[in-house]
């Protein structure tokens, strides 16, 4: 039962043990792992592919991924925030809508809120994986993981606090 109840530490230990035993000419797939730092750790240990509901489920629950951590759009501080979810994000949502408007839609239970937040989170994950590929190509994946740890561990993200 990998990724079904074990701690992140146990999962990382299992992945670290198993991936060297898998064939190098076959893709290595880890199901159900979707937190950014967990993905980065798994990639660092040789995993190639993932699938997980986290980007879409979290979007439906008002949790938005950014390069600075998680934004919880339902928090009152976003009532009047006219900025996009992430300033330099090029997704459709960030180019066209403010946090306050998305929060308003979410609080009104408008289905458009879930759609806009999902668009953003899926785009974030595409960019996140692109950054991982660049970090691998530039031989600085370890440094990139340290940056991610500074972001997500400081927010308590790896312990399910999102």
Task: Give short role names for the model-derived ranges.
Residues 1-85:
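Glycine-rich phosphate/ribose-binding loops and adjacent secondary-structure elements
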Residues 86-162:
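C-terminal extensions of enzymes
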């Amino acid at each position: 039962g990998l990724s079904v109840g074990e701690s992140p530490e146990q999962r990382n230990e299992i992945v670290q043990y198993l991936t060297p035993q898998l064939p190098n000419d076959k893709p290595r797939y880890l199901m159900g792992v979707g937190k950014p730092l967990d993905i980065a750790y798994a990639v660092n240990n040789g995993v190639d592919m993932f699938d997980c509901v986290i980007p879409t489920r979290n979007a439906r629950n008002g949790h938005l991924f950014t390069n600075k951590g998680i934004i919880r759009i339902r928090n009152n501080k976003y009532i009047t925030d006219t900025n996009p979810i992430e300033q330099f994000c090029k997704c459709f949502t960030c180019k066209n809508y403010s946090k306050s408007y998305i929060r308003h839609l979410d609080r009104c239970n408008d289905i458009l809120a879930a759609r806009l937040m999902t668009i953003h989170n899926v785009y974030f994950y595409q960019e996140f994986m692109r950054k991982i590929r660049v970090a691998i190509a530039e031989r600085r994946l370890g440094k990139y993981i340290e940056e991610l740890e500074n972001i997500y561990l400081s927010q308590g993200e790896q312990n399910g606090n999102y």
